[in-house]
Curated annotation (Swiss-Prot):
Presence of keyword Disulfide bond: no
Keyword line: Lipoyl
Record organism: Burkholderia multivorans (strain ATCC 17616 / 249)
Cofactor: (R)-lipoate
Protein's name in the database: Glycine cleavage system H protein
Any GO BP: glycine decarboxylation via glycine cleavage system
Cellular compartments per GO CC: cytosol; glycine cleavage complex
Lineage: Bacteria, Pseudomonadati, Pseudomonadota, Betaproteobacteria, Burkholderiales
Family: Belongs to the GcvH family.
Domain Lipoyl-binding: 24-105
Keyword Kinase: no
InterPro entries with a match to the protein in the record: 2-oxoA_DH_lipoyl-BS (IPR003016), Biotin_lipoyl (IPR000089), GCV_H (IPR002930), GCV_H/Fam206 (IPR033753), GCV_H_sub (IPR017453), Single_hybrid_motif (IPR011053)
Amino acid sequence: MSNVPADLKYTEEHEWIRTEADGTLTVGITDHAQSTLGDIVFLELPEVGKQVTAGDAVGVVESVKAASDIYSPVSGEIVEINSAIVDTPDSVNSDAYASWLFKIKLADGASTDKLIDAAAYGKLID
């Protein structure tokens, strides 16, 4: 069974989301996603300042097995990317939940209602 921290929210597309004290959301891919993909060799992340809509493809994760889109879990503005992880994409394999990809500020009126909790995500990947 994959590691599914209870304090995070998730998407059905295998992204994890942590709400920060300032209200921004930190986004990464789940342990299940990295395990399924295998050794990650390349990450393409969104540009800071980009306005995105929930469900938009905002980046790409490439492994030795496959390439997969990274989706925005909510509508908002990309406010930061983890540029260090672009240089060491394999760190996602080592610790998916410490290896965040980008931070997003919710758009006015946007919500996190469609995100799922750890229990629901655990059932999804069982």
